[in-house]
Design a protein with these regions (language model features):
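A short, Lys/Arg-rich alpha-helix, primarily the initiator
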Residues: 2-27
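Localized chelating/binding microdomains
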Residues: 21-24, 30, 36, 73-85
């Protein structure tokens, strides 16, 4: 039996929002499900799952379909995504490479 994954309400709503935005973009372009699925290289059933906000869909597929129909993946501002990536990687470089948990013994003999 497959293990059932649980998600926060916020994550579920975000997936549904992405799905309806994709569906809106597809319909605004007057593309059928079959047409968009062929453009994305996926099955029509997978596209239907994406448009419903199914959390089991691969994030790469969701991003690709969203891009095809013109859904903005991140806030559009003056900085292109490549600059956002570089900026975020610079921030990561300032942080420790390893996160170590403290192994202090708990003193509960009070």
């Amino acid at each position: 039996m497959a293990k059932q994954r649980t998600y926060s309400q916020h994550a579920l709503e975000a997936a549904v929002l992405m799905g309806v935005q994709i569906k809106l973009g597809r319909k605004q372009r007057r593309w059928s499900e079959k047409n968009l699925a062929e453009r994305a290289g996926i099955s029509r059933a997978t596209l239907q799952k994406i448009e419903k906000g199914d959390m089991s869909c691969a994030v790469g597929l969701v991003f690709e379909v969203a891009t095809l129909v013109g859904v903005k993946l991140f806030e559009s501002d003056s900085m292109p995504l490549s600059k956002h990536i570089e900026h975020t990687r610079d921030k990561i470089a300032l942080l420790p490479q390893r996160i170590q948990t403290s192994k202090k013994a708990v003193r509960d003999d009070f």
